């Protein structure tokens, strides 16, 4: 019997409705009790608690105020928690969106530990990010690294895949302080000058 392959469903841009279904708070709608959102770590989660924040810019340098991000990261011990449960002190998966006014996204999490790649080589602490936004038919994959992990960054096999050092800088979040708490700023530029490096994962 011949095998019939199903055609691939075409991708579509995120459109104006992604916030209604996945980012209720950002859309100004009542939130659900069981919501996957931007707080990956509860106060009792082990590790260094940090705030991540940033903005998304298009090729003309304008803020993309309706973008949506999904993140996947290891815990402070470098282990991925693949069983999502809102009762967990820490979950590896989270979501956030840029606000319609300031165009800024935030994540409350812990700084991830070192994870080995498939070959057993340590990768610098990082957070995987998928970006969904208007005009993007297939979401974009990037990574966030930390500027105070210079030694680990210099040895990271993934960062070193990027030949130009100045391009690697587009993946480095800058440490800062927000309301007395440790934070890292990571702005994403979809295209144009200073375009963020995206991966074909």
Curated annotation (Swiss-Prot):
Binds Fe(3+) ion per subunit. It comes from Pseudomonas putida. InterPro entries: Intradiol_dOase_C, Intradiol_dOase_core, Intradiol_RC_Dioxygenase, Protocat_dOase_a. It is an enzyme of class 1 (oxidoreductase). It comes from the Bacteria. The lineage of its organism: Bacteria, Pseudomonadati, Pseudomonadota, Gammaproteobacteria, Pseudomonadales. 3,4-dihydroxybenzoate binds at residue 134. Pathway: Aromatic compound metabolism; beta-ketoadipate pathway; 3-carboxy-cis,cis-muconate from 3,4-dihydroxybenzoate: step 1/1. The keyword Iron applies. The keyword Iron applies. Belongs to the intradiol ring-cleavage dioxygenase family. Its EC number is 1.13.11.3. The enzyme is an oligomer of 12 copies of the alpha and beta chains. Keywords: Aromatic hydrocarbons catabolism, Dioxygenase, Iron, Oxidoreductase. This is Protocatechuate 3,4-dioxygenase alpha chain.
């Amino acid at each position: 019997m011949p095998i019939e392959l199903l055609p691939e469903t075409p991708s579509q841009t995120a459109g104006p409705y992604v916030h209604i279904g996945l980012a209720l708070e950002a859309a100004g709608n009542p939130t659900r009790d069981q919501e996957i959102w931007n707080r990956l770590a509860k106060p009792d989660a082990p590790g260094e608690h940090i705030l991540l924040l940033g903005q998304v810019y298009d090729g003309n340098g304008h803020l993309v105020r309706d973008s949506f991000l999904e993140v996947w990261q290891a815990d402070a011990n470098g282990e991925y928690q693949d069983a999502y449960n809102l009762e967990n002190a820490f979950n590896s998966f989270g979501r956030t969106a840029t606000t319609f006014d300031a165009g800024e996204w935030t994540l409350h999490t812990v700084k991830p530990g070192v994870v080995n790649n498939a070959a057993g080589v340590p990768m610098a602490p990082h957070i995987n990010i998928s970006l969904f936004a208007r005009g993007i038919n297939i979401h974009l994959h990037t990574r966030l690294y930390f500027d105070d992990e210079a030694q680990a960054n210099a040895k990271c096999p993934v960062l070193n895949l990027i030949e130009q050092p100045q391009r690697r800088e587009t993946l480095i979040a800058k440490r800062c302080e927000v309301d007395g708490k440790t934070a890292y700023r990571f702005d994403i530029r979809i295209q144009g000058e200073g375009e963020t490096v995206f991966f074909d994962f």
